[in-house]
Amino acid sequence: MKDLLISLGFDYKENAKDVLIKPYTNHEKYSIEINLEKNNINFGDKIFFNDSRNSNQNITKPEDLVVLECVDRLLKKGYKPQNIILEKVYPTGHGTSGRLDILVTNKDNKAFMMIECKTWGKEFDKAYDKLKKDGGQLFTYFQQDKDAQILVLYTSELINKKLEYKNEIIKIEEEYRNTSNVKDFFDRWNKVTKNNGVFNDWNTPYNYESKALTPKDLIDIKQEDSSFIFNRFMEILRHNVVSDKPNAFNKIFTLFLCKIMDEK
C-alpha cells in the first residue's frame, strides 16, 4: 500500500510518522490523509460518504485503494471535492439497497458521473462481463437517478512501479432516460463502451468527450492480453454459430491490422 501512496504523491506528515498526506493545490490546498497505523483514510472536510458528514474510512479490502486512487485522479483532473460522494446508497428493489462507489455531481448538485470501482484483473473482468450481459450494478443505479450523464466501470493497479488504469464508459443518450427499468435500458443500449474521454488531456471536468484511437495510442501486446483477446473472439464466434472459427479469427485480425496501417 505504501508504494501506491508514494506513487500518488503522498508524503509523510510533519511530526506524524505513521500519517501520509497529500495536498491538492488546485483545490485551495485541500488534502487527504492516510493513517498507516490505524489503516484509515481521511478524505478531508468536503468529500463525504452517502451525503453524511463522515469522511473517514477504514481500509478493509483492496477495492478501497482503487476508490482512493480514483478520487485522487478526479481531484487532479479538476473535479471539486464537494462534488464527490462516496458509497452513495440507492434502492435496488425488493427492500434492498446498493452502494455506488463514487458519485460525481455537477455545480447544481445533480448526478453527473457514476463510477463503480473494481480491483485489477478478475474482479474488473467479471464486472465488465456482467455489464455486457445485463447492465450490472451501474444500470440499476442509473434507474434511480437519471440525471447522470456518464457511467464508468473503473480499475487501477501499480504495475512495475507505474500506475495503470482502465475505464469502460457509457455515455447516456436521451432515449435511455425514458426507460422504465434496467432491462428496458439494456435493450435500448447499443452495447458499446468507450475507454477514453474522462481523464484524458483533451477533456475538461464535467465535460465528456471521447475520441477514436490512433496509432500513437497503441501499446505492445502482452501474453495475457493475446489470450484474453483470442478467448473473446472465440466467444463472439460461438455466439454467432461460426463453424470455421480459426479461419474467421485470422480474417478478422487481419482486418484490424489493415485498419491500423491505413490510419498511419
Describe the role of every protein-language-model region.
Residues N54, I59-L86, F256:
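Short, well-structured hydrophobic secondary-structure segments
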Residues I85, V89-P91, F124-N181:
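Nucleic-acid nuclease catalytic cores
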Residues K80, R99, A111, K146-Q149:
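Short loop/turn motifs at secondary-structure junctions
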Residues V152-K264:
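Charged, often flexible domain-edge or linker segments that flank or initiate folded functional domains
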Residues K61, L65-E69, S97, K133-G136, ...:
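Short, well-structured alpha-helical interface segments that form or flank functional binding sites
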Residues M1-K61:
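Interdomain/boundary linker segments immediately adjacent to catalytic/signaling cores
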Residues K17-E33, N58-I59, Q82-N109:
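Active-site metal-binding core of divalent-cation-utilizing nuclease and nuclease-like domains
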